[in-house]
Amino acid sequence: MLTFYPRFIRTFTDLPGHLSLLIHAWNGCNMRCYGCHNDAELIAQKPVPHLLLTPEQTLERLSGSDGLFDAVLFSGGEFLISSAAELESFLRRVRLIFSGKIIVMTNGTFPGKLKHLLELALIDGVHIDMKLPFHLLNPAEDAEVFKAIIGAKPTVRFCEDILDSVDLVIRHNSILSQVRTVRYPLLSEEFFVQIASYIEQLKDKYDSIVPYYLNPYHPPQK
């Protein structure tokens, strides 16, 4: 079931030029990324039911913020790990009570759900992470790289799903979207060069204005 962390965060930086409200779903994640800032509170911990917000409670709190924020950003964990029906139902209700923009943050492993939400115009933008040059790596030969950065044992399909999601976001062509990479200290500069080159080629292909950000690595606070 879709549940939410009760601490909403006001942010000026996640969506440049907009005052946004960041809301984390407490629904787990299918990655265990190096230096994840949400791991201790939202992923590694077992959810405590009485501390979580239901979709109804989240919508009630969000409705009181309408007009105060330009956008709401839904993150996780991995927000799209919930069922397509549950996501659609929830975001339809968000549209009814919140007049600002709706952004979803994702690791890209659920392109089908992402495509569905974009086609229904239930979200205005997507912030997607391209953590590795998935178009170049081999899940078997580069298993140690995957383990070190995303903490998961991938398959070819896993990599293809992420690339499909990145393609969707760039083709959707919203200035509210972002493709992002963290400059992980474990990786050589060549990794980041290859990712940036891949994104630029897609942007040229679709004449897309979606920005790409190579962000510095900030270790989680202890």
How would you name each of these model-derived features?
Residues 62-63, 80-220:
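Conserved AdoMet/S-adenosylmethionine-binding subsite of the radical SAM
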Residues 16-18, 29, 67-68, 98, ...:
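Residue-level preference for short coil/turn positions at secondary-structure junctions
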Residues 54, 67-76, 80-90:
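Glycine/proline-rich, flexible active-site/cofactor-binding loop segments
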Residues 1-25, 29-47, 65-66:
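N-terminal [4Fe-4S]-dependent radical SAM core
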Residues 33-41, 67-71, 136-143, 176-177:
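Short, basic/glycine-rich phosphate-binding loops at helix/coil junctions
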Residues 22-24, 71-75, 103:
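Short, conserved beta-strand segments within well-ordered enzyme catalytic domains
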Residues 39-73:
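Conserved alpha-helical substructure of the radical SAM core
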